[in-house]
């Protein structure tokens, strides 16, 4: 049994929900290509700086901007923070795999980490949380969910 935990921002907990549904035998909208014994330990939606500090227990880098305590990083910063989130949630939950997602300006950052492997990727859609319309933000979110699950599958193979 592979234990997975997520700390999500721009994917709003949908990665965790999809993993849980798959593990229980009723996958949602994602077409899984692996057959793995997986369990979701925890799925956290953490869009704010205060949430990172109080729940994930690390001091995040200073963002480019904030919107009501919601962190807005550049794409490069998102990659770094997603990795920090994935490492932290994995450690705090004693999971085998940790997943972190965050997106402010650009394609966002998506990280999956295990004891001996770490990978960081981006969604396929650029947007800016400060200025993009809802459709662009939601397109980036859908892309991020798919990309995160595809990356997770590469760890499960």
Swiss-Prot record:
<protein>
    <recommendedName>
        <fullName>UPF0254 protein MTH_1148</fullName>
    </recommendedName>
</protein>
<dbReference type="InterPro" id="IPR009625">
    <property type="entry name" value="HcgF"/>
</dbReference>
<comment type="similarity">
    <text>Belongs to the UPF0254 family.</text>
</comment>
<dbReference type="Pfam" id="PF06787">
    <property type="entry name" value="HcgF"/>
</dbReference>
């Amino acid at each position: 049994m592979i234990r997975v935990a997520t700390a999500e921002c721009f994917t709003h907990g949908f990665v965790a929900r999809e993993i849980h549904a798959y593990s229980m035998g009723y996958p949602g909208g994602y077409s899984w290509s692996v057959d793995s014994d997986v369990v979701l330990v925890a799925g956290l939606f953490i869009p704010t700086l205060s949430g990172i500090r109080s729940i994930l227990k690390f001091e995040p880098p200073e963002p480019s901007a904030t919107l009501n305590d919601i962190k807005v990083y550049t794409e490069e910063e998102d990659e770094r923070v997603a990795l920090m989130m994935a490492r932290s949630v994995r450690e705090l939950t004693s999971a085998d795999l940790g997943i972190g997602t965050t997106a402010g300006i650009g394609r966002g950052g998506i990280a999956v980490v295990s004891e001996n492997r770490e990978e960081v990727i981006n969604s396929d859609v650029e947007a800016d949380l400060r200025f993009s319309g809802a459709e662009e933000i939601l397109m980036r979110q859908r892309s991020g969910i798919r990309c995160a699950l595809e990356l997770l599958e590469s760890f499960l193979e």
